């Protein structure tokens, strides 16, 4: 029964995390249509990519047995985020933006390669799991914490236009699903970061309940832009994971903060 419950929460986490990973698609369709990244930033997608790669590696059977559902969603997330980064490179609005994105992508590849090779060639058993788990956990916590700037903005402006309800709900549900999955599997490297994600998602929902009837100072087009940025969490999210990643606030890419395990 416990294994079945773990499986069901893992599947639930996969479905919700996939939604968070795909949330920036409208932004990238706009980039492709206009053939320019405009003021959007590629930083969130590179950060979500390294998180997905490390989490997917951690979930592999020879690193962490019985965590294949962690690998499936983060493997899918890595493919999606790679596509985002490629689009960013192709349609970068300036040469500087392209070089910056390329440099970050190279750093992501280097860090992942280092962790993977060291864990594969130099470590075994629990030592391998420890290295990969710590690396994935640190990245996941950083991604989950990234929406703090948006939460601060909501409190400052008293406007939830900066924090879409469905995205906040998805972050909470995703974090909670993976938190319970980690508890059932007795895996601290899944439980700890997603416990943080669940808590921060709950805080976002509380803020939404408090300020949902207020337009605040962020009404109008400014609020719309900030709201779009927040959808790009994913990834992240999360988690997962804000829908645009505007340069004015790269930290909104909590995505796969909110979505990663």
UniProtKB/Swiss-Prot annotation:
InterPro entries according to UniProt: SWEET (IPR047664), SWEET_rpt (IPR004316)
Residue span of region Disordered: 218-261
Keyword annotations of the record: Cell membrane, Membrane, Repeat, Sugar transport, Transmembrane, Transmembrane helix, Transport
GO molecular function, a single term: sugar transmembrane transporter activity
Residues annotated as domain MtN3/slv: 7-95, 133-215
Segments in the Cytoplasmic topological domain: 28-42, 93-101, 151-164, 211-261
Compartmental location: Cell membrane
Membrane topology: Multi-pass membrane protein
Family of the protein in this entry: Belongs to the SWEET sugar transporter family.
Description of how the protein assembles with itself and partners: Forms homodimers.
PANTHER family: BIDIRECTIONAL SUGAR TRANSPORTER SWEET1, RAG1-ACTIVATING PROTEIN 1
Protein name: Bidirectional sugar transporter SWEET1b
Organism per entry: Oryza sativa subsp. indica (Rice)
Gene name of the record: SWEET1B
